[in-house]
From Swiss-Prot:
Residues 597-610 have a biased composition (Basic and acidic residues). It comes from Veillonella parvula (strain ATCC 10790 / DSM 2008 / CCUG 5123 / JCM 12972 / NCTC 11810 / Te3). This is ATP-dependent zinc metalloprotease FtsH. Zn(2+) binds at residues 416, 420, 492. Residues 28-101 are extracellular. The gene is ftsH. GO terms for molecular function: ATP binding; ATP hydrolysis activity; ATP-dependent peptidase activity; metalloendopeptidase activity; zinc ion binding. It comes from the Bacteria. It is a multi-pass membrane protein. The lineage of its organism: Bacteria, Bacillati, Bacillota, Negativicutes, Veillonellales. Residues 1-6, 123-642 are cytoplasmic. Its EC number is 3.4.24.-.
Length: 642
């Protein structure tokens, strides 16, 4: 129980004791005896009663002639007054009883007391505790001392450049003479920018664990709350505390909550958040000296930060913490696998190859899911099977094996996924097929997984055209074999449209329109940007853009239709294999293409194979025709858009 709550309880107990004491005191009767009504009438008839006072609740307060006072209670008796008069008793009628003064005072004070207590309670909750009700202008930053943070730079992997930048900051704080002797100045601020989950906050924790100096940590959203002026006051208080503890480090997580561009959006530019930002700008690089204070901030939206915040003198360094490459992913997996028992068949390098685009948080979640799966199966070690399943679960969602799928839907899904896989397998510029399944997972009824053979920072025009053709493979397979199309290709068609439009309007891959970017990026008001931009091209150009997009998709559709028609047996074989086995891997896809079955036939005596050797071509398919079709498609996907 907090100090504030204890005080409130104490005050309430004191008030209750006071009320009880007064009530007990006022209820005492001083030298008054109780007299029954019969006894009272007898006393009256014996002429021993001097006077009575009758109250409005039938109560009787009387006085005997010997001076004794008494109380009695009279039932409804119409002859009572006459009896009293006949016996010479002085009669007085008492007015209605008024409550005691203290009762009136207490009745008026209780609502006020309740309101005051409620106000104090709300203020205490608003400020998150701390024992002081009116401390909302104070900084809520947490001071991390030595030993409080167990994370070090050894726990950070996959972001070597960012780690090196921050290691230099820590080294300056530990040995400033090394830098000052040659005239170097430590950066006043370091901005960590990158996608979510790449390790920005982890790097800050590593700095806190390694620095050996006071480390203040606060979130950008902690500056601004419900009162005007609180944000600026908290910024001042934060830097005041930092100056007292210099040299030190201030870490502001999610700085975009307070550092967004000023003067943008609706409603003008004078609001509480902007005043907080102005105060932050002054504290970081104003007239006052902040020697020995280094500010580190993290955000995944550097594009919406105010330019004044990013200039040298405030955040001198902007460190990009991007998604890790192959080597980085392997290093991250090794860090997260330290406390997990892995079986001998687990190869972290293979896992790293199969997880392009994964962030550090994704990889940590992957190994954790693998550990949970192994525990669910009562295993003592984590095998490669659990890691593979966890990888797909993180990417696509959990399997839905209990989901009831009709035979018609299973057949449609099998041909749909076979269409994707066959086009990807036959086109040279498409990513190789890794796995095909018709088991529902997440929101998908089935999926075809393709993995690049190497890390890719860019995509060529040929690869983009191949991606369009692979995406169309599912819809075209449905139309060719089932003579029907379904809504299952909605996501594929969206991907096709987006890629084709980007090729024409963003990447300048159209010979008709040339290397020009059409249309400015639309920024949303809540991101701190302008409300929008006008289209920067004419209606004639808009018509040409639509025509080019349509032409790209139409050509791809025709090419894929021809490819799948020429390899119809391959399509049937793969669909049947999926219906039977539900999941096939890359080796099975290759065997289906060569032998018409998922398993490689037993080795026979070697023989010289001609260009159109029927032993490696599916039965019923013209080898020359198949070879020429693939070659034609390869050439088509490489040609420039005309």
């Amino acid at each position: 129980m907090g100090r504030f709550t204890k005080n409130i309880v104490l005050y309430l107990l004191i008030i209750a004791a006071f009320v009880i004491a007064i009530d007990a005191f006022s209820g005492q009767s001083a030298n008054k005896s109780e007299l029954s009504y019969t006894g009272f009438i007898q006393q009256v008839q014996q002429k021993k009663v001097e006077s009575v006072t009758i109250t409005n609740d039938h109560g009787i307060k009387g006085k005997l002639k010997n001076g004794t006072e008494f109380n009695s209670y009279a039932p409804t008796d119409e002859t009572l007054i006459k009896t009293l008069q006949d016996n010479g008793v002085e009669i007085t009628a008492a007015p209605p009883e008024q409550p005691a003064w203290w009762m009136s005072l207490l009745g008026s004070a209780i609502p006020i007391i309740i309101l005051v207590v409620l106000f104090f309670f709300i203020m205490q909750q608003t400020q998150g505790g701390g024992g002081r009700v009116m401390n909302f202008g104070k900084s809520r930053a947490k001071l991390m001392g030595e030993g409080n943070v167990k994370v070090s730079f050894k726990d950070v992997a996959g972001a070597e450049e960012a780690k090196q930048e921050l290691e230099e900051v820590v080294e300056f704080l530990k040995d400033p003479g090394k830098f000052t002797t040659i005239g170097a100045k430590i950066p006043k601020g370091v901005l960590l920018a990158g996608p979510p989950g790449t390790g920005k906050t982890l790097l800050a924790k590593a700095v806190a664990g390694e620095a050996g100096v006071p480390f203040f940590t606060i979130s950008g959203s902690d500056f601004v709350e419900m009162f005007v002026g609180v944000g600026a006051s908290r910024v001042r208080d934060l830097f005041t505390q930092a100056k007292k503890n210099a040299p030190c480090i201030i870490f502001i997580d999610e700085i975009d909550a307070v550092g967004r561009q000023r003067g943008a959006g609706l409603g003008g530019g004078h609001d509480e958040r902007e005043q907080t930002l102005n105060q932050l700008l002054v504290e970081m690089d104003g007239f006052g000296a902040n020697e020995g204070i280094i500010t580190i901030a993290a955000t995944n939206r550097p594009d919406i930060l105010d330019p004044a915040l990013l200039r040298p003198g405030r955040f001198d360094r902007q460190v990009i913490v991007g998604r890790p490459d192959l080597r980085g992913r392997e290093a991250i997996l090794k860090v997260h696998a330290r406390n997990k028992p892995l079986a001998d068949d687990v190869d972290l390098k293979i896992i790293a190859k199969k997880t392009p685009g994964f962030t550090g948080a994704d990889l940590s979640n992957l190994l954790n899911e693998a550990a949970l799966l192994a525990a669910r199966l009562n295993k003592k070690v984590i095998t490669m099977a659990e890691v593979e399943e966890a990888s797909e679960k993180v990417s696509m969602g959990p399997e839905r094996r209990s989901h009831i799928v009709s035979d018609k839907d299973r057949k449609l899904t099998a041909y749909h996924e076979s269409g994707h896989a066959i086009v990807a397998h036959l086109l040279p510029h498409a990513d190789p097929v890794h796995k095909v399944t018709i088991i529902p997972r997440g929101a998908a009824g089935g999926y075809t997984m393709m993995l690049p053979t190497e890390e890719q920072n860019y995509k060529t025009k040929s690869q983009l055209l191949a991606d369009i053709r692979v995406a169309l493979g599912g819809r075209i397979a449905e139309a060719l074999i089932l003579d029907e199309i379904s809504t299952g290709a909605s996501g594929d068609l969206q991907s096709v449209t987006n890629t084709a439009r980007a090729m024409v309007t963003r990447w300048g891959m159209s010979d008709e329109l040339g290397p020009i970017v059409f249309g400015e990026q639309q920024e949303q008001i809540f991101l701190g940007k302008n409300l929008g931009h006008e289209r920067n091209y004419s209606e004639e150009i808009a018509a040409k853009i639509d025509s080019e997009i349509h032409r790209i998709v139409e050509e791809a559709y025709k090419d894929v239709t021809k490819l799948l028609s020429d390899n119809e047996k391959f399509l049937h074989d793969m669909a049947n294999a999926l219906l039977e086995e539900e999941t096939i891997d890359a080796k099975a896809v290759d065997n289906l293409y060569k032998y018409g079955t998922t398993k490689e036939p037993e080795a026979e005596e070697p023989k010289v194979a001609s260009e159109a050797d029927s032993s490696i071509v599916p039965e019923g398919v013209d080898a020359k025709k198949t070879t020429s079709t693939v070659a034609d498609l390869s050439e088509a996907s490489s040609n420039e858009i005309k």
